[in-house]
Amino acid sequence: MRPEGSLTYWVPERLRQGFCGVGRAAQALVCASAKEGTAFRMEAVQEGAAGVESEQAALGEEAVLLLDDIMAEVEVVAEEEGLVERREEAQRAQQAVPGPGPMTPESALEELLAVQVELEPVNAQARKAFSRQREKMERRRKPHLDRRGAVIQSVPGFWANVIANHPQMSALITDEDEDMLSYMVSLEVEEEKHPVHLCKIMLFFRSNPYFQNKVITKEYLVNITEYRASHSTPIEWYLDYEVEAYRRRHHNSSLNFFNWFSDHNFAGSNKIAEILCKDLWRNPLQYYKRMKPPEEGTETSGDSQLLS
């Protein structure tokens, strides 16, 4: 019979079998007791190779996520126990003071300090839970993003089409920009939350007559109100285009895609970064325009109708 106040977790039989691929089956028991603190015990026994290999990776990932949840629950229980103990100590201290009286400013500040002390572990617990949940969701999103990227590789000019058809971006793109974007083969966005919130935009290009770079990376520090330029890969223009690039950058001082692309600190360029990170990257397909195939018996022309 388990002690009162304890939490016991058993790894399901299906997950234990999932570890056969590495030669071990794991059975996890986590027990958090209000009297004896938190204890975590992992018992592993050697088992022979069994199961279907194609399921092992998925089972292993599921086991990792389950153990993450278990550890998160253990931390929550431990922190709650500590908070209960601190509250009980504060109550005993208050009971030791003879006679309740009107609260003076000094006593009010002491009470406020005690409440703030109690609040700190709750805030820390919330931050840990949020961070762990975000990391878990990122792990689950990654295989889908990888698959999406592989599929997009089979659609020529996908990202150029998407960027040019975005309602805000379309006003910032010239014909020369569209030609440059036609050499773009992939777009990737990565976000880091710690130690600072950072958004990294990576644009991948095939060989083109404009610049030598295969990958151009732009990084932005993100806060509540804006995206602030942090770092950008220097563009290695070909000599045949370097003069033209200089002319374009200084001839037009308004915000456009080329100025954002070539000058990381160009005024207002953070707006383009925000569109790429928060809108285009999350659902690019909504801005992709497909060419409508001609109907049978009709003559084809250069002006094909677009499908949203």
Swiss-Prot record:
<dbReference type="GO" id="GO:0003682">
    <property type="term" value="F:chromatin binding"/>
</dbReference>
<keyword id="KW-0221">Differentiation</keyword>
<keyword id="KW-0744">Spermatogenesis</keyword>
<dbReference type="GO" id="GO:0005634">
    <property type="term" value="C:nucleus"/>
</dbReference>
<dbReference type="GO" id="GO:0006334">
    <property type="term" value="P:nucleosome assembly"/>
</dbReference>
<dbReference type="GO" id="GO:0000785">
    <property type="term" value="C:chromatin"/>
</dbReference>
<dbReference type="GO" id="GO:0042393">
    <property type="term" value="F:histone binding"/>
</dbReference>
<dbReference type="InterPro" id="IPR037231">
    <property type="entry name" value="NAP-like_sf"/>
</dbReference>
<comment type="similarity">
    <text>Belongs to the nucleosome assembly protein (NAP) family.</text>
</comment>
<protein>
    <recommendedName>
        <fullName>Testis-specific Y-encoded protein 8</fullName>
    </recommendedName>
</protein>
<dbReference type="GO" id="GO:0005737">
    <property type="term" value="C:cytoplasm"/>
</dbReference>
<keyword id="KW-0217">Developmental protein</keyword>
<dbReference type="InterPro" id="IPR002164">
    <property type="entry name" value="NAP_family"/>
</dbReference>
<comment type="function">
    <text>May be involved in sperm differentiation and proliferation.</text>
</comment>
<dbReference type="GO" id="GO:0030154">
    <property type="term" value="P:cell differentiation"/>
</dbReference>
<dbReference type="GO" id="GO:0007283">
    <property type="term" value="P:spermatogenesis"/>
</dbReference>
<dbReference type="Pfam" id="PF00956">
    <property type="entry name" value="NAP"/>
</dbReference>
<keyword id="KW-0334">Gonadal differentiation</keyword>
<dbReference type="GO" id="GO:0007506">
    <property type="term" value="P:gonadal mesoderm development"/>
</dbReference>
<keyword id="KW-0963">Cytoplasm</keyword>
<keyword id="KW-0539">Nucleus</keyword>
